[in-house]
């Protein structure tokens, strides 16, 4: 699977800047450098920066540059590599890259440098995900979590999982090797106890990966309610500026209005939806249709009611929409007026007044607490889709093994299932034999990384 050919890319991005960086890596990359780079000293020592000129085959100067050299295995990719710091003009960077490509390199694919780092055992897949998140982080909290994952500060759950599975595998091998003698001091109850612990750890890892998704991918929050209850006013108060048009005319919002809020490190995309009621025209019908779509896609729903008016049919429709939804916050707006609205007893509403600007911080606090329930920053991880699928498969497999123990199946058969369980957990860190799956892991990286 390892391609050690020379790859190159503009690592600083194809944008005009003061300095541009062209990254090159692969077997014989230092020999390539000697063909095009003319410093005062042509013997390259690692971890030093050399000043000189890049020249083409006709000895024409392409640029005056600084070059840093890295020798295998002590480089980002684990291979011989170098980086050219040139002037940051678009044409200069392209000329430098073309010069490298003409002398034996090929253009790197997105994420190929990091893929080589993984294949050369410089990083595991958890750290690869962390690198993506470092680049894409939108908040300081997301950046801190990504650094923790890169430095392997939050992989204790996975290590604990591996240890417990290895223990069961080793104990099962004793039963296979000595079928006539009961040399194991582990009884059925202890095996089942360990499997229960494995199941809980997998569930915990899935839960914390969901928290990681919030920090790195953000959360969709839909504000819903009948017309003229203050949805647009609430959007403006949450975001701190007048993003949505606010009038006394019901049905002003006919399309989804969105704005982003940084809520204690979590990027929140707030959607102000059209008021839900029996539509009066086609435009309003389309707006209400989009509101229902936003409700289905939202991670959290904020249902807004006018506390100064009695409950009506439109309010009841809203309550019916949210009754089977998991993450819902009920908000009573216009709390500065006399309250006339009566809600079912099992509802714990948040009273606010957009006019008086009260209760907004309480709403933000409730929203944040709903997102980070049972949250532990040191254990939050970011997993890609294939890793989450592997975890869910591991969860099902653990239950299958538990049944096999209870049914007293042959240890040789249980051994196969234990190995499969171990393989699923290994996929989280990096045991992937399918090249297509591996390519898919790194496709979301930018070129040059």
Language-model regions, residue ranges each:
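Inter-motif core of Ras-like GTPase G domains
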Residues: 284-308
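Short beta->alpha junction loops/turns
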Residues: 25-26, 89, 250, 307-308, ...
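C-terminal-of-GTPase-core extension/linker across diverse P-loop GTPases
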Residues: 2-10, 14, 55, 140-259, ...
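Conserved beta-strand segments of alpha/beta enzyme cores
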Residues: 106, 267-269, 348
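Switch I (G2) and immediately adjacent beta-strands of P-loop GTPase domains
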Residues: 51-71, 251-279, 297-300
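Glycine-rich, N-terminal phosphate-binding loop of Rossmann-like dinucleotide-binding domains
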Residues: 88, 238, 273, 305-308
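Generic enzyme active-site microenvironment
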Residues: 270, 304, 331
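A glycine-rich (often HGG/GG-containing) alpha/beta subdomain
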Residues: 1-144, 148, 152, 163, ...
């Amino acid at each position: 699977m390892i391609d050690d050919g020379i790859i190159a890319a503009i690592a600083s991005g194809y944008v005009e800047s003061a300095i541009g960086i062209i990254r090159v890596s692969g077997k014989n990359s230092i020999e390539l450098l000697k063909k095009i780079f003319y410093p005062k000293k042509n013997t390259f020592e690692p971890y030093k920066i050399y000043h000189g000129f890049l020249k083409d085959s006709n000895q024409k100067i392409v640029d005056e540059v600084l070059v840093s050299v890295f020798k295998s295995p002590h480089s980002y990719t684990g291979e011989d590599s170098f980086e050219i710091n040139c002037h940051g003009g678009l044409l200069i960077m392209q000329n430098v890259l073309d010069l490298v490509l003409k002398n034996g390199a090929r253009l790197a694919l997105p994420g190929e440098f990091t893929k080589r780092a993984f294949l050369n055992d410089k990083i595991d897949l958890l750290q690869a995900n962390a690198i993506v998140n470092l680049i894409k982080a939108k908040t300081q909290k997301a950046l801190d979590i990504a650094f923790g994952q890169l430095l392997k500060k939050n992989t204790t759950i996975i290590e604990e999982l591996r240890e417990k599975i290895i223990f069961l595998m080793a104990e099962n091998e004793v039963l296979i090797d000595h079928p006539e003698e009961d040399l194991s001091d582990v009884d059925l109850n202890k095996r089942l106890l360990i499997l229960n612990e494995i199941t809980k750890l997998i569930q915990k890892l899935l839960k914390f990966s969901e928290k990681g998704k919030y920090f790195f991918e953000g959360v969709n929050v839909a504000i819903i309610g009948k017309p003229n209850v203050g949805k647009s006013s609430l959007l403006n108060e949450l975001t701190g500026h007048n993003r949505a048009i606010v009038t006394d005319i019901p049905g002003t919002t006919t399309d989804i209005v969105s704005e982003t809020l940084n809520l204690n490190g979590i990027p929140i995309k707030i959607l102000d939806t059209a008021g839900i009621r029996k539509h009066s025209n086609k435009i309003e019908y389309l707006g209400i249709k989009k509101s229902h779509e936003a409700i289905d896609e939202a991670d959290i729903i904020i249902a807004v009611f006018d506390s100064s008016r009695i409950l009506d049919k439109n309010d009841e429709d809203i309550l019916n929409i949210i009754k089977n939804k998991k993450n819902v916050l009920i908000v009573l707006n216009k709390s500065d007026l006399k309250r006339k609205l009566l809600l079912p007893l099992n509802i714990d509403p948040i009273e606010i007044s957009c006019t008086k600007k009260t209760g907004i911080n309480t709403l933000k606090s409730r929203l944040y607490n709903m997102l980070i329930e049972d949250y532990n920053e040191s254990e939050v991880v970011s997993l890609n889709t294939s890793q989450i699928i592997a975890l869910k498969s591991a969860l099902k497999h653990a239950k299958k093994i538990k049944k096999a123990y209870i049914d007293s199946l042959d240890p040789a058969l249980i051994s196969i299932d234990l190995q499969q369980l171990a393989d699923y957990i290994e996929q989280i860190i990096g045991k992937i034999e399918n090249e297509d799956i591996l390519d898919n892991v790194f496709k979301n990286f930018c070129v040059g990384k």
